[in-house]
Amino acid sequence: MANSDPIYGWLETALATIKKANWYRQPKTITSQSGATVTLNGQSVVNFASNDYLGLAGDRRLIDAAIAATEALGTGSTGSRLTSGHRQLHQDLEQAIANLKQTEDALVFSSGYLANFGTISAITNKKDLILGDQYNHSSLKNGAKLSGATVLEYDHNDLDALRQLLETHRQNYRRCLITTDSVFSMDGDLCLLPELLAIAKEFSTMLLVDEAHGTGVLGQKGAGVVEHFHCTQQPLIQVGTLSKALGSLGGYVAGSKALIDFLRNRASTWIYTTGLSPADTAAALAAIHILQEEPQRRQQLWENIRQLKSALGNHELVPSESAVLCFGLANPQQALAMGDRLLATGFFAPAIRPPTVPTSRIRVSVMATHSPQQIQGFIEIFQRCFAEFSGSSNL
């Protein structure tokens, strides 16, 4: 396609606007195995950018499980789970997820994004109302749009605003669904789950909780925010991913048998896509076993989180109760400059900018496999960089 084609000329104009606003993004290439230290664009750096909270993505046991599954079953599932793509391994993983979450059943999707898309659009339509937290993940927001339901947002974690919307609108719709992240991925704070459950019950409303950043991190056994708040076996829908603390790929929905059976028959993003590969499925299953058998991994993660929060809590830290720590900066230029300086000194903690978030920040993801030396080194460098860039009026 010629660059001068007038039909596509708007693309260059749009890109120029994105660059002018400092919103332009390009991927950075990692050429090593996942871990607390990675090789990024040829440079060895300590990795504070990964969602691999337990350090399992490079664990030999996950790798061996993936290899064994590939040798036994091939590289791909080769079809929809309803045609030629279903394997016993999928069923084993779903049972393991249900056991972890203490739900009746679970369903594995090819990604967490697809799990949210498919679930929300299957259980709601134009006769229904969806109320979502303002800071929800894109997959929750776009799944709601896809459903055709009326979609309203409430201010972040503002239960009074949510209640007011329900009092005003609930009676006008057949069914209603409240959607929320359990851990808000760009802030690190938690949803107010017990209160949300009480409101959902009062207004006869379904509740869907996205545990993407909670599973493997929070809860007595690592089951997530639902377990953390002692809300296990309450009437709700749990959605999550296998690609963060569990170190693999894919997504899941956990809930009642009726819900899961319904989704097998109505969730388009499960029905009309190839099943999760044997390698990814086996790796996720191995990760769940490790999560349950090695609680010390999660304990070490929280020790690392506590050290960082204690040392850096007065550096514009956004309130956090998770492995995601965000530090506010005045504008995208400051955030980009600080992210570049951190990288130059051997620490990968990227700048996050609008439109992904309302305000610019450095986002730090903590891992169980960060060593004490790496934690202390990061604290020292971060303090120096933050003092320099947070006060830079010329950026």
Curated annotation (Swiss-Prot):
Recorded superkingdom: Bacteria
Keyword Cytoplasm included in the entry's annotation: no
PROSITE patterns: AA_TRANSFER_CLASS_2
Enzyme class (EC, first level): transferase
Residue(s) carrying N6-(pyridoxal phosphate)lysine: 244
Stretches assigned to coiled coil: none
Enzyme Commission number(s) of this protein: 2.3.1.47
Listed pathway(s): Cofactor biosynthesis; biotin biosynthesis
Cofactors named for this entry: pyridoxal 5'-phosphate
Positions with a binding annotation for pyridoxal 5'-phosphate: 112-113, 185, 210-213, 241-244
Pfam families referenced in this protein's UniProt entry, alphabetically: Aminotran_1_2
GO BP field: biotin biosynthetic process
Positions annotated to bind substrate: 25, 137, 356
UniProtKB keywords: Biotin biosynthesis, Pyridoxal phosphate, Transferase
Keyword Cell cycle recorded: no
Reactions catalysed: 6-carboxyhexanoyl-[ACP] + L-alanine + H(+) = (8S)-8-amino-7-oxononanoate + holo-[ACP] + CO2
One GO MF term attached to the UniProt entry: pyridoxal phosphate binding
Complexes and interactors: Homodimer.
NCBIfam families: bioF
PANTHER family in UniProt: 8-AMINO-7-OXONONANOATE SYNTHASE, CLASS II AMINOTRANSFERASE/8-AMINO-7-OXONONANOATE SYNTHASE
Task performed by this protein: Catalyzes the decarboxylative condensation of pimeloyl-[acyl-carrier protein] and L-alanine to produce 8-amino-7-oxononanoate (AON), [acyl-carrier protein], and carbon dioxide.
Family of this protein: Belongs to the class-II pyridoxal-phosphate-dependent aminotransferase family. BioF subfamily.
Protein's recorded name: Putative 8-amino-7-oxononanoate synthase
Organism annotation: Picosynechococcus sp. (strain ATCC 27264 / PCC 7002 / PR-6)
